[in-house]
């Protein structure tokens, strides 16, 4: 455990950021999985789920949770899947 006050504060800050980042990554993954499942099942709301998934990927990239190249790759794969 840290002894210096600033180190204690950094541990608290890092824990808060970790919780926030984990939640946003989970939400992004869930949105992508919902789109994939709906596309496979041939659901009616595929359009809305596609927009939600691409938005979630863009948001994760803008927050620095994933790299821009991974975001572009994921969106490209979803777009190809959406077009089929």
UniProtKB/Swiss-Prot annotation:
Reading the lineage from the top rank, the first entry is: Bacteria
Q: Which GO terms describe its biological process?
A: translation
Keyword RNA-binding found: yes
One example GO MF annotation = structural constituent of ribosome
What Pfam families does its record include?
Answer: Ribosomal_S20p
Q: Which SUPFAM superfamilies match?
A: Ribosomal protein S20
What GO cellular component entries does it have?
cytosol; small ribosomal subunit
Q: Which InterPro entries match?
A: Ribosomal_bS20 (IPR002583), Ribosomal_bS20_sf (IPR036510)
UniProt keywords (A-Z) are:
Ribonucleoprotein, Ribosomal protein, RNA-binding, rRNA-binding
What this chain does, per the entry, is described as: Binds directly to 16S ribosomal RNA.
Record-stated family: Belongs to the bacterial ribosomal protein bS20 family.
Protein's name according to its UniProt entry? Small ribosomal subunit protein bS20
Q: Which organism is it from?
A: Lactiplantibacillus plantarum (strain ATCC BAA-793 / NCIMB 8826 / WCFS1) (Lactobacillus plantarum)
**Gene behind this protein:** rpsT
